[in-house]
UniProtKB/Swiss-Prot annotation:
PANTHER family: COLD SHOCK DOMAIN CONTAINING PROTEINS (PTHR11544)
Intracellular or extracellular location(s): Cytoplasm
Molecular-function GO terms, alphabetical: DNA binding
Record lineage: Bacteria, Pseudomonadati, Pseudomonadota, Alphaproteobacteria, Hyphomicrobiales
GO cellular component terms given for this protein: cytosol
PROSITE patterns cross-referenced by the UniProt entry: CSD_1, CSD_2
CDD domains linked to this entry: CSP_CDS (cd04458)
First-listed, main subcellular location of the protein, grouped into a coarse class: cytoplasm
Protein known as: Probable cold shock protein y4cH
Listed Pfam families: CSD (PF00313)
Domain of life, source organism: Bacteria
Organism the protein comes from: Sinorhizobium fredii (strain NBRC 101917 / NGR234)
Keywords annotated in UniProt: Activator, Cytoplasm, DNA-binding, Plasmid, Transcription, Transcription regulation
Residues annotated as domain CSD: 5-65
Length: 69
């Protein structure tokens, strides 16, 4: 199931940023690799985005993937 939110900030140089979910839950980490997999060049601050919340197999942390702008 897709979640929706707003890009809080994204730094392409650092390769990551955060999405503020519309449901008021904790901010979601987003890595540049997820942006590239989605075929997007960048995320803009304040941009609306749909995403899936996935758990990283290595770190166990949650992040956004399958992004749709």
């Amino acid at each position: 199931m897709m979640a929706t939110g707003t890009v809080k900030w994204f730094n392409a140089t650092k390769g990551f940023g955060f999405i503020q979910p519309d449901d008021g839950s904790a901010d979601v980490f987003v890595h540049i690799s997820a942006v590239e997999r989605a075929g997007l060049r960048e995320l803009k601050d304040g941009q609306k985005i749909s995403y899936e919340l996935v758990k990283d197999r290595k770190s166990g942390k949650m992040s956004a993937d399958n992004l749709q702008a």
